[in-house]
Amino acid sequence: MVSTHNRDKPWDTDDIDKWKIEEFKEEDNASGQPFAEESSFMTLFPKYRESYLKTIWNDVTRALDKHNIACVLDLVEGSMTVKTTRKTYDPAIILKARDLIKLLARSVPFPQAVKILQDDMACDVIKIGNFVTNKERFVKRRQRLVGPNGNTLKALELLTKCYILVQGNTVSAMGPFKGLKEVRRVVEDCMKNIHPIYHIKELMIKRELAKRPELANEDWSRFLPMFKKRNVARKKPKKIRNVEKKVYTPFPPAQLPRKVDLEIESGEYFLSKREKQMKKLNEQKEKQMEREIERQEERAKDFIAPEEEAYKPNQN
């Protein structure tokens, strides 16, 4: 067979963007037949998102109807479902619809989440809850990702061209694939105790180097800073003891009560062996109940709804 590799290709000009994703239109479905099987995806959402989802669900339905995707909001089970219909012509739009409901469940506002239906937009939900076992350390590192007044997060958004939302045990990101890769690296390293400022400096240098065409085919590692991890032991503050001089008394200290004396005083001494065991069990159960109530209150703090701006529905 004759090779066509070295032949002239007059249609292949430099102004053609070969990486551009062409929009899939209805006429591109040559057969015109509906899909052989129905595809559907379902995701659960937390209780505090219920009121917000009810207010925006008409807009969600309207946005998905343009792509012939059906959606169902089940407030009893706390779930959102998307599925293809007989009119659906784009085989990949169901995956975009799945990402839409996933972002809505993770507290992403609807005006931002609906952009995922565009071809040039992708998303990534990064789980950060499993990196650190200590709750206080986890909260500290998550706050480090946000930064003072959200400055660290804004810098990352500008450098990666992604929308980033930190919520609970996840970080939701939307943007191009190249930016999402950088966001995941920064977030995971931050939870591994590597400060985001190091990555921000690196991304700023890369952005400046990308403006110079003569460095397009060169290795940039010589321009990037190399940070060494240093574990410096902190000096522990000296404990100052408050030693007060005791007043001298010639009399010996009073004798401490024995265990039997305490039992006689409380009346436990006169109980039978079985009654003592029952009393001990009841005390243990009361302590367990108190601990369980404290744990439930601690867990409930994670499900407090974040402050959101009031959503104004689209009148058009």
From Swiss-Prot:
Residues 279-316 are annotated as: Disordered. One of its GO terms (cellular component) is nucleoplasm. It holds the Pfam family KH_KRR1_1st. SUPFAM superfamilies: Eukaryotic type KH-domain (KH-domain type I) (SSF54791). GO terms for molecular function: RNA binding. Its main location: nucleus. It comes from the Eukaryota. Component of the ribosomal small subunit (SSU) processome composed of at least 40 protein subunits and snoRNA U3. Interacts with snoRNA U3. Interacts with MPP10, KRI1 and with ribosomal proteins RPS1A, RPS4A, RPS4B, RPS8A, RPS8B, RPS11A, RPS11B, RPS13, RPS24, RPS25, RPL4A, RPL7B, RPL8, RPL23, RPL25 and RPL28. Belongs to the KRR1 family. PANTHER family: HIV-1 REV BINDING PROTEIN 2, 3, KRR1 SMALL SUBUNIT PROCESSOME COMPONENT HOMOLOG. Present with 4340 molecules/cell in log phase SD medium. Required for 40S ribosome biogenesis. Involved in nucleolar processing of pre-18S ribosomal RNA and ribosome assembly. Essential for vegetative growth. This is KRR1 small subunit processome component. It comes from Saccharomyces cerevisiae (strain ATCC 204508 / S288c).
